[in-house]
Every structure is written in C-alpha cells, then in structure tokens.
C-alpha cells in the first residue's frame, strides 16, 4: 500500500471516532441547544493523524546532532516498511550502489 492509502485509512479511523462522539452528543444534549460548534470536536481526527506520523514504520526522528548528520539522514532512503521491501526479498539490484553515486 502507498503512504497516501495508509494516511487515508488513519483519517477514516479518526472520522469514525468523531462520528461516534457526535452521535453520542446528539443523544445527550437538548435539541434546542445543539449547534455545530457544540457537536463537532476534531481531536479524534488530529489524534489519529499524529498517531500515524508518530508511530508508523515510515516515520523517523531526524538525526540532528550536527549539520552533517542531519544532511546524511535526509539523503537516506528506506524502501522497508509496510508495502515496501523486506530484507529477505531485497535482491542484488536493490542492494547495489546506484550509478549516480
């Protein structure tokens, strides 16, 4: 799966949590006092997105010990993770040095 699909799934999870909160508030609040501002809370959606970027295998903390380590970290590219290569399936053409180097 692509990164976009993974983020889309997380947003769906957040929206379903928000829907559950809205439905619960609609049953507990007075009909005359209900406004969109009192019903809708975006915290579940924000929490789902933060959870994805904080705990996903595709996210990394950037090495910022010094400017050179930050630069080399930005140059690294990993094709591992969900939907990518595994260490067992990576062939020689993937492990070989690219001709541009």
UniProtKB/Swiss-Prot annotation:
Catalytic activity: RNA(n) + a ribonucleoside 5'-triphosphate = RNA(n+1) + diphosphate
UniProt GO BP: DNA-templated transcription
Domain of life: Bacteria
A Pfam family of this chain: RNA_pol_Rpb2_3
InterPro entries: RNA_pol_Rpb2_3
Self-association state and partner proteins as the record states: The RNAP catalytic core consists of 2 alpha, 1 beta, 1 beta' and 1 omega subunit. When a sigma factor is associated with the core the holoenzyme is formed, which can initiate transcription.
Region (Disordered): 74-101
Catalytic EC class: transferase
Keyword Cell inner membrane found: no
Protein name: DNA-directed RNA polymerase subunit beta
Entry keywords, A to Z: DNA-directed RNA polymerase, Nucleotidyltransferase, Transcription, Transferase
Family statement: Belongs to the RNA polymerase beta chain family.
Function noted in UniProt: DNA-dependent RNA polymerase catalyzes the transcription of DNA into RNA using the four ribonucleoside triphosphates as substrates.
Any one GO cellular component localisation term in the record: DNA-directed RNA polymerase complex
EC number: 2.7.7.6
Compositional bias annotation for Basic and acidic residues: 86-101
């Amino acid at each position: 799966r692509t990164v976009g699909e993974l983020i889309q799934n997380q947003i769906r999870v957040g929206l379903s949590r928000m829907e559950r909160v809205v439905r619960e508030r609609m049953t507990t609040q007075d009909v005359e006092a209900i406004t969109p501002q009192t019903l809708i809370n975006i915290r579940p959606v924000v929490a789902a997105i933060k959870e994805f970027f904080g705990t996903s295998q595709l996210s990394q903390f950037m090495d910022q010990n010094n400017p050179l380590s930050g630069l080399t970290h930005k140059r690294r590219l990993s094709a591992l993770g969900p939907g990518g290569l595994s260490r067992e399936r990576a062939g020689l053409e993937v492990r070989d040095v690219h001709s541009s180097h």
